[in-house]
Amino acid sequence: MSPVLAGVLQLVALIAALALAYRPLGDYMAKVYSSDKHLRVEKWIYKGIGADPDTQMRWPAYLRGVLAFSAVSVLFLYVLQRVQGSLPGSLGFRSIDPDQAFNTAASFVTNTNWQSYYGEQAMGHVVQTGGLAVQNFVSASVGIAVAVALVRGFSRSRTGELGNFWSDLVRGTVRVLLPVSVIAAIVLVACGAIQNFSGIHSVGQFMGGSQQWNGGAVASQEAIKEAGTNGGGYFNANSAHPFENPGPFSNLFEIFLILLIPFALTRTFGRMVGSLRQGYAILATMVTIWIGFTALMMWTEFAHHGPAFQIAGGAMEGKETRFGVGGSSIFAVATTLTSTGAVDSFHSSFTGLGGGITLLSMQLGEIAPGGTGSGLYGILIMAVIAVFIAGLMVGRTPEYLGKKIGTREIKFAACYILITPALALVFTAAAMALPTPGHSMTNSGAHGFSEILYAYTSGANNNGSAFAGLNADTQWFNTTIGIVMLLGRFVPMVFVLALAGSLAEQKPIPATVGTLRTEKPLFTGLLVGAILIITGLTYFPALALGPLAEGLAS
């Protein structure tokens, strides 16, 4: 079987698996977030944290809950790393330095999982399981909660109430993420991923000498790392490591986990707003971009540019032979179009245009299908922008799902789409202009610029992957990327919740003959066009200096 055919068959199998899971999971999540009942274990949690799950919150109160919980999480994870040397199960590792502890705490709480450290050489069992893995669950649940709050803004009327943050947080963790992760961990263990609390083993090598291998609760962390679109690896090699991702089936299964919840949330959206066709329109937009980018990536990586590529069956530099070009390309697009950032290959070693696709995938705002929760609210913001543009073209007041998109709403949406590129581009410019950050670049020219741009784009979009030729473990990058991750996560949430509150207060407008039918293919095309044009206008100058220049030169 040719490598190209193998890659296409993997993509077909992945689409089929996602299609089978779409309806049951999407409907289940709609029931979870619409139910008035609380499980017994949830009641214990509410009692322990002193929260009343039945109190409805307006958007400022909901936002305070998000920020307070996240602030406490950052502080807890920072302290846990700083005292690691005194904890049992530390495997002899020292406590983490202040700048790196801040960067890691910000990274995992924001669902970014950017790592400027070697996991198997820095973090013991307690920090990995009691700190990082816990944040993998709750940071993903925070994202879903904010997305659900925005959906309620569309579905509710004449009220500013968006639900209860604490209830949404606990339900997302207990009823959605935990069950999915338990099943996924069992599958990964069956595939060969390790799951233990062993110490460091010294293993003899065929050529003489020895190698140090770490044990750990890898399968359980790998499951939520992918299902929660987190991405932080137990090992430095991330999902290229055989202990995390043993073979071709586990690789395809991990891609399935990455895409599962973000795609299914469009069904949840359709259920909660009372129109499944609205959810299908959003799904069609996501799928169009995802398949288009995947096909383009496979073409760039399979394209033969000389005898070495012909023999290898594509651009194999930086890729695992057990995954091949096809599996690595599908994984790379999935991980950058979502907020995952996990890698099974070395993105810096992709072709110039292939590396540009991973960068552009993040710059779209990770909305196809995007992160767990963040993908849905991101594309709904873009839908508001698209409706507004359509309204300007025909001279009508824009409406979406029966809600008027006025000056106030469009200001919130505009601020949302501006904050992330501003963070990425401003900090990239600062790093290139100042002398000290440049010392971390191992490559010069267009590729070196791409490394810096990729790092800040990854941080601002809460992705976490990297062009790993950059030495990011410095005070400058640990501090600035940490700040970018926090601002890139929580400032957009302010505008999302403010928009949700504004929409929830409105009286629904009945559809008329002139109302734009947002469930039709025409709107899907308009939305895809708006996403690509806005992204292109924002990032094209920077892309021209980096991956485009490198790709054309080669």
Curated annotation (Swiss-Prot):
Keyword vocabulary terms for this entry: Cell membrane, Ion transport, Membrane, Potassium, Potassium transport, Transmembrane, Transmembrane helix, Transport
Record Pfam families: KdpA (PF03814)
Subcellular location, record wording: Cell membrane
Source organism (scientific name): Streptomyces avermitilis (strain ATCC 31267 / DSM 46492 / JCM 5070 / NBRC 14893 / NCIMB 12804 / NRRL 8165 / MA-4680)
Function description: Part of the high-affinity ATP-driven potassium transport (or Kdp) system, which catalyzes the hydrolysis of ATP coupled with the electrogenic transport of potassium into the cytoplasm. This subunit binds the extracellular potassium ions and delivers the ions to the membrane domain of KdpB through an intramembrane tunnel.
Name the record gives this protein: Potassium-transporting ATPase potassium-binding subunit
Subunit structure: The system is composed of three essential subunits: KdpA, KdpB and KdpC.
Key word Membrane present: yes
GO molecular function, one term: potassium ion binding
Topological type in the membrane: Multi-pass membrane protein
Sequence similarity: Belongs to the KdpA family.
Transmembrane annotation, as ranges: 1-21, 60-80, 131-151, 174-194, 246-266, 279-299, 375-395, 412-432, 481-501, 525-545
Entries under HAMAP family matching the protein: KdpA
A GO cellular-component term linked to this record: plasma membrane
Matches recorded under NCBIfam families: kdpA
InterPro entries linked to this entry: KdpA
